[in-house]
Amino acid sequence: MRTYLLNVQEPYKTFILNWEKIFEWRLNKWKFAEMQVWDILEFENTKEKFEIISKNIFANFSKMMENLWFEKVIPDAESIDDAVNNVYYKFYSPEDEKKFWVVAIEIKKI
């Protein structure tokens, strides 16, 4: 079991702490590709810890949203299109999404 430091921006950090968001999503590269079920995520500034209870890889953000509880991935998005175009693509390009695919990490506070 490994521990990974994680930086999550607001409002998503608050959504996680309030249990409104149970999936953290990233491109499937670097440390996110290495993470495994039972590993620990630790918020960088607050030191709260979360256990990874599932990890799923999808071809793109839309497929991820179609297969997971939409409200538990991006609680403040109005639709899948809104989440993809106004949230995900602020962080990642469609080219990187296609190259690396997407990982959805289900977490539980410990």
PLM segments and residue spans:
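Short beta-strand-centered aromatic/proline hotspots
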Residues: 48-58
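Short, solvent-exposed secondary-structure boundary/capping segments
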Residues: 56-71
